[in-house]
């Protein structure tokens, strides 16, 4: 007993053409003979999927199937006959040829004239934060494949030329019969090129290309970030038989800086201050990455972790280089170490002279803590 066509494709009877085609594509790829060589069950499912789609993709056949089921397509020689006359081998061939031609093409398949696009190349480059700030022009050397100058890219020895492939007759594809439909595959004799080289070029060994180091000038724009990718069109490996060159991708990483940390277009810098400067106030100079200095005033009583913002002193934005981020100064207060006896005595004297107004947070905290423990003792 035949399985329901909708069940075969895993769709409902109400599904539209788009869902029907999507289900067919998924199953056809899953059970394609190229992916399941020698698997008879996969071959059976593949044929079954094609048969179901052949009916359901056609509005008239689908309407007849919805009304009469499989009986609509049986040649039982009874009155009136079968208006559809069963399935023709050509129908399946057309379905799979269109489907797999669309899927396997997609810009990756070799052209019918044998032209192939060259491979893309990648290059990793490390730059300093200063170079990321101002931009630079860098010279790089990359190993790549270029067209062989001895055979001019034909792959054949001088005085000879490639021969048309006797298996595919220059098409680059061959058809293999699978029951009542045929499958188109890449020709194994010429790897889809449509030609074979019987007398290869001694320089490139028939590959049509040779390896060579090339020197390139790369423009690094100001404002690039760690992980930025630059694409140089046509600077990858050479194409074959007049095919386009691949592209070169430059992947940039920015070295950690001694003083500045970066967050987007903003820069952050930690400045240590002595306890005395933080208490009495003062000022200091700081330079941004273009060397311009700015004076930062420290008010009396500056606390650890305080932040100062210098507008427009950060990094330029990659796509709006006239706009810059900000520079944030983070204050860290340095507690004195290895005190002399005199320094220790002075600090102890300072502590005795201090009151809660000098250190409101610590005074208030310890007062509350003392009160807390006194209450606990009183309860016990």
From Swiss-Prot:
Signal peptide annotation: none
SMART domains linked to this entry: DnaJ (SM00271)
Presence of keyword Isomerase: no
InterPro entries (UniProt xref): DnaJ, DnaJ_C, DnaJ_domain, DnaJ_domain_CS, HSP40/DnaJ_pept-bd, HSP_DnaJ_Cys-rich_dom, HSP_DnaJ_Cys-rich_dom_sf, J_dom_sf
Binding note for cofactor: Binds 2 Zn(2+) ions per monomer.
Gene3D superfamilies: DnaJ domain, Heat shock protein DnaJ, cysteine-rich domain, Urease metallochaperone UreE, N-terminal domain
Locations listed in the record: Cytoplasm
J domain location: 4-69
Annotated CXXCXGXG motif repeat ranges: 148-155, 165-172, 187-194, 201-208
Keyword vocabulary terms for this entry: Chaperone, Cytoplasm, DNA replication, Metal-binding, Repeat, Stress response, Zinc, Zinc-finger
Chain positions recorded as Zn(2+) 1 binding sites: 148, 151, 201, 204
Keyword presence, Transferase: no
GO molecular function: ATP binding; heat shock protein binding; unfolded protein binding; zinc ion binding
Chain positions of all zinc fingers (CR-type): 135-213
Amino acids binding Zn(2+) 2: 165, 168, 187, 190
GO CC entries: cytoplasm
PROSITE patterns attached to this UniProt entry: DNAJ_1, DNAJ_2, ZF_CR
Subunit relationships: Homodimer.
HAMAP family: DnaJ
Domain comment in the entry: The J domain is necessary and sufficient to stimulate DnaK ATPase activity. Zinc center 1 plays an important role in the autonomous, DnaK-independent chaperone activity of DnaJ. Zinc center 2 is essential for interaction with DnaK and for DnaJ activity.
Role noted for this protein: Participates actively in the response to hyperosmotic and heat shock by preventing the aggregation of stress-denatured proteins and by disaggregating proteins, also in an autonomous, DnaK-independent fashion. Unfolded proteins bind initially to DnaJ; upon interaction with the DnaJ-bound protein, DnaK hydrolyzes its bound ATP, resulting in the formation of a stable complex. GrpE releases ADP from DnaK; ATP binding to DnaK triggers the release of the substrate protein, thus completing the reaction cycle.
Name the record gives this protein: Chaperone protein DnaJ
Encoding gene (name): dnaJ
